[in-house]
């Protein structure tokens, strides 16, 4: 595997700190981070809201390069991606920090961690990709926290994965500015974007972000890149699960992205700062799925609940059950190696390369062998 070109070292910093190109100087002496719309304006030594991007001298640096957490081999459907290399194993991991502040965060122990040293293992990009290859994975996934905040590390890991013949997946909230967005997704093969709700009010009150930026990211991915894109909405009782909001979201996706973009409705569990909200009833997910299908979307799924009907991929031409799933196990696979319905020959949107994998529902934590940090 070819070595990656090391990233420039930052004078006076440790081996986990690299410079970034996403910042600008302000007249008052502060430096503004330009990765996301939050636009943190920092004085010397200050960190942004994400915690992992900080001011050192006349630049913004990433302080978590090569520090990763949660190494685990999962089925790719767990990202969730139902139309991308079905049934195959993916090496999943994250780092620390996040540029959103969701009150309902389901991974808050990682995304809100300030204990980078104790949380994270060390893994350079080449070693990580080689480990994924050795363990039989088809791809790597940046998940648990948002790759937006560690995009330099994510980009290098993705390049190393491609050199090893693997694909790279970003699981993201899509809250990112256009220049950083172009850089991050130029290295990715697939993405699942969390569309957390379909009102600006929810984004402001609950996620402390903006809906419009996320919609811009979705339109960019679907219309301006070759990145295979699926969408997830976590339905939170009483906050984003009304018929009207679900219908509006579904109609927007159908009109602006196209009816073939898969949409996943997943169940909320009480966590972080919203422990007083009850779990999502399975009936809510089934109702949302029906509304989205009625709005013209062709591939709508339910998640975090046992719902075989809501997890089955159906040919929209002839009605054949193409991929029958029981949780993350594939019980029937009727898609050709070239991505067509075996019954009628209709194209199935997605990335299909050969027969389905047989990884199943296993979740296998792993350690990265011989950790070292090589920078790019």
Predicted regions and their residues:
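Short, cysteine/histidine-rich loop/knuckle motifs that typically chelate Zn2+
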Residues: 35, 49-52, 97-100, 104, ...
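Auxiliary Fe-S-binding modules of radical SAM enzymes
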Residues: 1-44, 239-376
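Conserved AdoMet/S-adenosylmethionine-binding subsite of the radical SAM
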Residues: 122-283
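A generic "binding-loop/recognition-motif" signal
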Residues: 46, 98, 199
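Conserved Radical SAM active-site core
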Residues: 55-190, 196, 360-367
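Iron-sulfur (Fe-S) cluster-binding segments and ferredoxin-like electron-carrier domains
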Residues: 39-63, 107-117, 324-328, 348-355
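N-terminal juxtadomain amphipathic helix
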Residues: 6-89
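Generic structural "secondary-structure junction" signal
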Residues: 33, 42, 51-52, 62-67, ...
